[in-house]
Amino acid sequence: MDIDREKEGKCLTVTVPCYNSESYLERCVESLLKERDGLEIILVDDGSTDRTGQLADQYARAYPDVVRVVHKKNGGHGSGVNAGLMLANGIYFKVVDSDDWLDEAAFHKLMSVLRFWCRTKEEKRPDLVVCNYVYDHLEEGKTKAVRYGNLFPEQKICRWDEIGCFSPEQYLVMHALIFRTGVLYNCGLKLPEHTFYVDNLFANCPLPFVQRIYYLNEDLYHYYLG
């Protein structure tokens, strides 16, 4: 990671790719703004034809030290992630889709942990932080949490040879992961444009570059299923 970017003092960059998201963008962004200390939010307006871009600009004006906006022609979800990663100043990087949101209490604990790691020497920081995520069927009033407590030791950094065996429902997905930004740069991550399921590439391509892992047993990410 570029040394000058680390000196910006941002601990976490959250990139939110947005396309025609005016009906739910507020829920997403408001969940992120609960933790502004050390946080950078990059809203990537991917050529929206509704008021998404205007809403994003309103947040940037209201929170100029936290929120940045990118307006670009439509390139798909992967293109939005790429745009956010190129501008990221945070030591850590996470993607949150615009129709999803983060749990307030879990996000507070995550940011507390990340702020601690960001104050330590680079060689002592985890390359990857893993949290639980929740499938939210809002219309049906049903939720299903995917947790990793049987796989990773808690409250310590571990390596791959210290974790358990994954069940078919416990594969690592984008929603569960917070990468050190330098890992994403080192692996040369660039997602294809106009392509479905690029979140699988985001989750898996950097893993060979990950050595140190920290598991936070919190239901952080809410994945909206309409």
Each model region followed by its residue ranges:
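Nucleotide-sugar donor-binding/catalytic module of glycosyltransferases
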Residues: M1-G226
